[in-house]
């Protein structure tokens, strides 16, 4: 729970189980807090096309109990307050753009590298949705010549998420990312794949800054490797002031892992404003 200045007033963590177990707990909490509006940043894919009859539903998720669950409608029905709705990574992008390291920029990308990989894209000051929402983790990447790993993604195999997410690291190397901190070869390979995704996004979307968050990025020593690999792959084709200052172009989040919560607060505030 936050106020209009983005200051956290209260918080609780509720495990994601089935909708039948999790939703009543969340609804009860927000009723108790008597919030004026709610912002939801939900795991994707979700349906964000307001013209779709499935708007506000979870899409084709591997969390089968949540597949096509009408998250937005259930919260609206239970709470009877304005509700803003987006993906979890879009909420994080919005949090950084409102209060964090991309504040004041019109074009930025927030990428989370963790259990999955996702991208929240802001273009001309607005969140990019389009047909659904960007699925930056499923960009196809070229395998490293010495990498025989087939990829973790059940849909695409060797996509960015399939090659560089936390579960991919664990399956390839036999240990979780935090247990591999001192293994240079792990992070050089991670940088090789993450940089491919960044270069694709730089070429296509021309962001003014890229933020890399998520659990894998807690291994902060990988940042310099990613920056170096990104510049190598760009190969001076794009030669801007931003890229020449790469340490301030590809950056870590600035909101102490609160960017998602604060982005949800902004979604709620925007929904409240729109309802007046």
Regions found by a protein language model. Give the residues of each.
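Gly/Thr-rich phosphate-binding beta-strand-loop-beta motif of the actin/hexokinase/Hsp70
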Residues: 1-8, 110-126, 169
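ATP-binding/phosphotransfer module of carbohydrate and carboxylate kinases, centering on a glycine-rich
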Residues: 1-37, 46-54, 73-83, 95-105, ...
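Active-site glycine-centered loops adjacent to acidic/histidine catalytic or metal-binding residues
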Residues: 88, 114, 264
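Short glycine-aspartate micro-motif
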Residues: 35-39, 84, 108-112, 118
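Adenylate-forming
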Residues: 92-98, 118-121, 140
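A charged helix-plus-loop insertion that forms the helical arch/lid used to bind
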Residues: 52-67
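Short secondary-structure boundary segments
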Residues: 42, 113-115, 214-215
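Short coil/turn connectors at secondary-structure junctions
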Residues: 80-81, 104-108, 117, 124, ...
């Amino acid at each position: 729970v936050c106020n209009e200045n983005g200051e956290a007033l209260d918080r609780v963590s509720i495990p994601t189980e089935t909708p039948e177990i999790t939703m009543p707990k969340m609804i009860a909490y927000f009723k108790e807090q008597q919030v004026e509006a709610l912002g939801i940043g939900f795991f994707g894919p979700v349906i964000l096309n307001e013209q779709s009859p499935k708007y506000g539903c979870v899409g084709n998720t591997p969390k089968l109990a949540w597949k096509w669950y009408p998250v937005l409608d259930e919260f609206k029905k239970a709470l009877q307050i304005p509700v803003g709705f987006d993906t979890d990574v879009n909420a994080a992008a919005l949090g950084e753009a409102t209060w964090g390291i991309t504040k004041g920029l019109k074009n930025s990308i927030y990428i989370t590298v963790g259990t999955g990989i996702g991208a929240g894209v802001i273009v001309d000051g607005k969140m990019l949705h389009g047909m659904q929402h960007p699925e930056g983790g499923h960009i196809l990447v070229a395998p490293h010549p010495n990498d025989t790993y087939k990829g973790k993604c059940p849909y695409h195999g060797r996509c960015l998420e399939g090659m560089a997410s936390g579960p991919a690291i664990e399956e390839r190397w036999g240990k979780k990312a935090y247990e591999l901190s001192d293994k240079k070869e792990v992070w050089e390979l991670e940088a090789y794949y993450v940089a491919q995704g960044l270069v694709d996004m730089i070429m296509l979307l021309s962001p003014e800054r890229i933020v890399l968050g998520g659990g894998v990025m807690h291994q902060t020593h990988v940042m310099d490797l990613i920056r170096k690999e990104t510049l190598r792959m760009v190969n001076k084709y794009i030669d801007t002031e931003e890229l020449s200052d790469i340490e301030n172009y590809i950056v870590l989040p600035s909101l102490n892992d609160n960017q998602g919560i604060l982005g949800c607060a902004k979604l709620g505030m925007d929904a409240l404003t729109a309802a007046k």
